[in-house]
């Protein structure tokens, strides 16, 4: 069983990345492929799912994201692909908070999640997200190598424009999902997100 891969990102695709470790390329499905950049060194925490038709690797930027994926995957009616789609749609801190507070309507916003499945998620996982919410484990505090330098500059600039750290942290996961761009473009996108309150 693999715990994580550490190597060089060689392919970034809308659905997956390829990480090369000791001359072998591993294709890993991830909710945030554009958080990685070709040529970057990275550590990806992986979950191996074996089915009759083969083996699939699912990868995450942190151990906590991997734990959340496994919890979602254990819910009746949620498979690995649905769990991945849920984690790609919003930041995981907000997701954990919604589960803890029983916000079924929030959960139905995710692809393929109806009211029945959303209720099942709350039923199965409510009371198990407290540590994630309380300790704020999903703040995307990952190594700098996984974040575009221009994005870091843009986040600092937004803070200098008068936005609070909380506001900047709220939009950071959304900006990280975008393809790499200039700091000016990140600032424009960030302002757009901030004004959509």
From Swiss-Prot:
Q: Name one Pfam family in it.
A: RuvA_C
Region described as Flexible linker: spans on this chain = 141-150
Which GO MF terms are attached to this record?
A: ATP binding; four-way junction DNA binding; four-way junction helicase activity
Please list where the region (Domain I) is annotated. 1-61
Record InterPro entries: DNA_helicase_Holl-junc_RuvA_I, Hlx-hairpin-Hlx_DNA-bd_motif, NA-bd_OB-fold, RuvA, RuvA_2-like, RuvA_C, RuvA_C_sf
Keyword list (alphabetical) reads: Cytoplasm, DNA damage, DNA recombination, DNA repair, DNA-binding
Residues of the region (Domain II) are: 62-140
Q: Which residue ranges are recorded for the region named Domain III?
A: 150-197
Q: Which CDD domains match?
A: UBA_RuvA_C (cd14332)
The alphabetized list of GO BP terms reads:
DNA recombination; DNA repair
Q: How does it assemble?
A: Homotetramer. Forms an RuvA(8)-RuvB(12)-Holliday junction (HJ) complex. HJ DNA is sandwiched between 2 RuvA tetramers; dsDNA enters through RuvA and exits via RuvB. An RuvB hexamer assembles on each DNA strand where it exits the tetramer. Each RuvB hexamer is contacted by two RuvA subunits (via domain III) on 2 adjacent RuvB subunits; this complex drives branch migration. In the full resolvosome a probable DNA-RuvA(4)-RuvB(12)-RuvC(2) complex forms which resolves the HJ.
Q: What does this protein do?
A: The RuvA-RuvB-RuvC complex processes Holliday junction (HJ) DNA during genetic recombination and DNA repair, while the RuvA-RuvB complex plays an important role in the rescue of blocked DNA replication forks via replication fork reversal (RFR). RuvA specifically binds to HJ cruciform DNA, conferring on it an open structure. The RuvB hexamer acts as an ATP-dependent pump, pulling dsDNA into and through the RuvAB complex. HJ branch migration allows RuvC to scan DNA until it finds its consensus sequence, where it cleaves and resolves the cruciform DNA.
The entry's protein name is: Holliday junction branch migration complex subunit RuvA
**Species of origin:** Lactobacillus delbrueckii subsp. bulgaricus (strain ATCC BAA-365 / Lb-18)
